[in-house]
């Protein structure tokens, strides 16, 4: 698995400048001008994701994985129900918390809502969970379960998930894109670990989210419930960021988004408890 990650990183740092220049060229020609609004870090992250997708097939071949069952996954006849329930279990607690934050003055509603931005995050909430759950809970956790016991595999997969999402270079790290800009972004990706409050409020929440998603995957032997959970968290937090304005920052209690801080951590734990209760009383599932 280390070789797989190394290949992804090497591909990402080399490809990110090419993707950035191609996007800027298209925007300059009037083709998809919205591409000009994305900074280099966005293309760096997309290059890493592209590398992860491209190298899946040789990775699976090397591990001799021929079907989803080899990764501990089974057919889910109730996939639509699990998808919807997962979405509600994650989104509703976040929305309730957001209402409280607005009522207490921590956030205020914007006078003008950015509907185009809302549309973009809605698309993100539909696509990203499919890709990331297939990678993190489908592939990575499945591979770890082949050599580790259940909870060590869950903890390690959650750590991988949180580290990858927490690694992010500060804004404006790359002001002029060169061939080595990917290496510069990679070097600065660890800067956030130098801020203890951000580590406590951000990394910890992401780690717990990884635990919840892995738990949902194992309890159902399917990716549909974690996909729903993931989509609910993204949509509820991202749409709120577009229609509301934060009035104060109170790390480690509340960070720059509704997925960073001890308050969001508590909200995620509520979702986990509700998930466990629902699965305990849900009708028996057939595979």
List each model region and its residues:
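Small-residue-rich segments of transmembrane alpha-helices in multi-pass membrane proteins
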Residues: 82, 147-154, 233-237
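Phosphate-recognition beta-domain surfaces
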Residues: 187
